[in-house]
Amino acid sequence: VAVLVTVRGWSADGEFALPARDAAEAGVAPHIIEAIRTGAVPEFADDHAAAEIYRFAAQLVQKGDTDQSIYSAIVARWGEVGAVELTALIGYYSMVAMTLNVHQIPVPPGIPSTLETKGNGLFESPTVDTKEC
């Protein structure tokens, strides 16, 4: 979820399709992947961990920081090391996405283009309320 939100946030078309496939294979529901792709609010149902990761990643990509409440939720669930690793993952995929965008690297052959706004800078993912999580 974090990778999808990050590369979607940077509108990196070439980097969305492969992680989307991997996320589906890892068990992320297709409706969540599609919501992230289209910019709709994902319905996480009872998957509070995924909702927190979504919110953390969306805030970090859009604002360069997160609200204390979501940071605290991530630390409570994953620990300080987990929060650092999640931040590093988002930072790494931000760098990859920016590199693909600035050098106009196309989607790999055989992989369909999936983003409607590709390479157009930051895309604002809607927030999801995780206060109930």
What are these regions (language model features)?
Residues 1-133:
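Hydrophobic alpha-helical segments
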